[in-house]
Structures are given as structure tokens and as C-alpha cells.
Curated annotation (Swiss-Prot):
Name of protein: Uncharacterized protein aq_250
Alphabetized UniProt keyword annotations: Metal-binding, Zinc, Zinc-finger
Metal-binding is among the record's keywords: yes
ZnF dksA C4-type span: 86-110
GO molecular function: zinc ion binding
């Protein structure tokens, strides 16, 4: 993989990570404002404070958490020099796929296989199913005008 592509992917990873963390901060600020508006003085408020990481994990969705982990893993792979190599077949992941999903671990073929094995595969039905010629309308389907 050339240095230019590697730097481009690294930048995309860092930008996506920043976006997710920004969404977290926005959520946190909103929760703080709402909490301050309805706050009653309590002695136990300071007890049991969470660490920043625990708060982060509590306030992010599961998808955002998984994406953050994948981004961090991809950044580690860049540092180790193993970024852009499919973890299943060992082939280089094509540039268009890396640009679209810079935290991907697999080439498209292997990703589909992994999804099938894990039960998360959703087939693409293609454009043809939306072709107006393929749509049949029965007379009873049409409401009276």
C-alpha cells in the first residue's frame, strides 16, 4: 500500500473517531443541562463517579462503541504495518473498499462470508427488482378514484 493511501485512510479514521466523540460530547452537554435544571442538592452526588471511559461507553450506542473499537484497531494496524490486509484471506483490500470503510478488516468477498457465517448477512437485491416493468398491479390493488 502506498503512503498516500495509507495517510488518506488514517485521516478518515481520525475524522470518523472525532465525529463519534463529538456526538458523545453533545449528548453529555444536553444531559448536563437537563440535570442542572431539575437538580436538587444531594450529598451522595459525588459518590461513585464514573471514569471518562465508563461515561463514554454508557452514552454511546452499541454501533458507535463497536465502530470506535474498530477504528482504534485499524489505527493500531497502521502503526504495525498490517493495515489494508484482509484478516481472512491475507490479500490486500482494494482501495475503493478502504476508502468507503477505512476500519474494515476484510475484503468484500470475505466480509460476505463472515456475515453469512455469523447470521448477519443481508443480500443485495439489485436494481432490477425496482424496475417498473417487473411490478404487477392487480385491479383490486387500485383504489377507486
Amino acid at each position: 500500500m502506498n503512503k498516500e493511501l495509507l495517510e488518506k485512510c488514517k485521516q478518515k479514521l481520525l475524522e470518523e473517531k472525532a465525529k463519534i466523540l463529538e456526538r458523545y460530547l453533545e449528548k453529555e452537554e444536553t444531559q448536563q443541562r437537563l440535570g442542572e435544571e431539575s437538580k436538587e442538592p444531594r450529598d451522595w452526588e459525588d459518590i461513585g463517579q464514573m471514569t471518562y471511559t465508563e461515561e463514554l461507553l454508557d452514552n454511546l450506542s452499541n454501533v458507535e462503541i463497536a465502530t470506535l473499537r474498530e477504528i482504534d484497531y485499524a489505527l493500531e494496524k497502521i502503526e504495525k504495518g498490517t493495515y489494508g490486509i484482509c484478516e481472512r484471506c491475507g490479500e490486500e483490500i482494494p482501495e475503493p473498499r478502504l476508502c468507503a470503510i477505512p476500519w474494515t478488516r476484510y475484503c468484500a468477498k470475505c466480509a460476505e462470508e463472515v456475515e453469512r457465517e455469523s447470521g448477519t448477512y443481508m443480500p443485495s437485491y439489485g436494481v432490477d427488482m425496482y424496475n417498473p416493468e417487473n411490478i404487477q398491479v392487480e385491479r383490486e390493488d387500485i383504489g377507486e378514484a
